[in-house]
């Protein structure tokens, strides 16, 4: 391990900080109106709308900067082929939404960010490893990831497989060596292992592959994505809140939030795959349809997919509102996730 993680601090400065502090409770109304195109936004003062926009977008950039710095510190130094492949796959762009959700949850639960840096890096390491393996010829066979060649194309298949394996094990080493109390570390390890394993992300990927070329029902499709996509999103929320003293009282609500957010995120991903181009997505567009994958647009059409997306987005927002202080940091990220373009 190359030291631990540096203390990296970010904050709103000047008038922006005081505006957000005084208007935080009102921003929920503002961003909800913006998201849903509600008529009431016409009656909201322009400075509130501007503040809401800043409030929605600034946290994501702040969390992205923090996780990039942290990841660069915990990955092995460049210079050897395996280390280079690990860094290529992990540091090569990406939205960092899982790490951002983890940090946002920690913020809303009053958990210092430096105490969850290890967990944020662990989630991103697991996500990067899953993308490496998903892109392999034996699985999704995709040559493009995050706007550049997939890891197995930039290096070779054997190196890509080993880089994914190394990132998988690194994730749990980070959690085991974090500065949190042993009981919390153990709970985080168990949470991530369950999310990434046979009953979570890996099981969902297996179900997705097994269902290729078949027609599924909506519950069957959602069951696959509950593991493939949703498990790691739910884990990120729990990992950020686990160090908090009031975690247990809100665990069920975090599950509910993660459930609906995971489904909404996957529907958005499917819609983008069907409607956006490769340059926008940073990966091969239209690949799901070409491979006979089960997607929401393929099963339901775009209009019905968008309707179900809106339903789960609203239910995610409602769950977040029941978290401590209305979870303003999580809510701000939900707005970014709901309106993502890639």
Feature-to-residue mapping (PLM):
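Short, Lys/Arg-enriched N-terminal segments with co-localized hydrophobic residues
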Residues: 41-55
């Amino acid at each position: 391990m190359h030291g631990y993680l540096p203390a990296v601090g970010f904050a709103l400065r000047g008038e922006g900080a005081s505006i957000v502090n005084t208007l935080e409770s009102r921003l929920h109304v503002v961003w909800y109106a913006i998201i849903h195109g509600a008529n009431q936004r016409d009656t909201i003062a322009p400075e509130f709308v501007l503040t809401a926009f800043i409030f929605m977008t600034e946290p994501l950039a702040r969390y992205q900067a923090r996780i990039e710095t942290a990841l660069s510190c915990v990955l092995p130094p460049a210079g050897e082929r395996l280390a280079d492949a690990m860094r290529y796959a992990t540091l090569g762009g990406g939205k960092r939404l899982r790490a951002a959700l983890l940090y946002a949850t920690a913020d809303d639960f009053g958990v210092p960010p430096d105490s969850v840096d290890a967990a944020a890096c662990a989630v991103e390491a697991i996500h990067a490893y899953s993308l490496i393996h998903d892109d392999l010829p034996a699985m999704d066979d995709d040559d493009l990831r995050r706007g550049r060649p997939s890891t197995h194309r930039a290096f070779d298949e054997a190196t890509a497989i080993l880089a994914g394996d190394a990132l998988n094990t690194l994730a749990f080493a980070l959690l085991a060596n974090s500065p949190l109390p042993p009981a919390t570390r153990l709970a985080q390890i168990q949470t991530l292992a369950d999310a990434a394993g046979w009953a979570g992300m890996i099981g969902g990927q297996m179900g997705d592959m097994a269902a290729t070329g078949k027609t599924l029902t909506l519950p069957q499709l959602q069951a696959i994505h509950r593991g493939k996509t949703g498990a790691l999103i739910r884990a990120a929320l729990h990992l950020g809140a686990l160090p908090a003293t009031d975690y247990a009282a809100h665990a069920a609500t975090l599950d509910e939030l993660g459930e609906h957010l995971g489904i909404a995120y996957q529907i958005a991903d499917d819609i983008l795959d069907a409607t956006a181009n490769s340059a926008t997505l940073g990966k091969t567009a239209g690949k799901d349809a070409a491979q006979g994958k089960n997607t929401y647009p393929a099963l339901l059409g775009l209009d019905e997919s968008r309707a179900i997306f809106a339903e789960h987005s609203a239910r995610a927002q409602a769950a977040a509102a029941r978290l401590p202080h209305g979870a303003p940091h999580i809510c701000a990220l939900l707005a970014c996730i709901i309106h993502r373009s890639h």
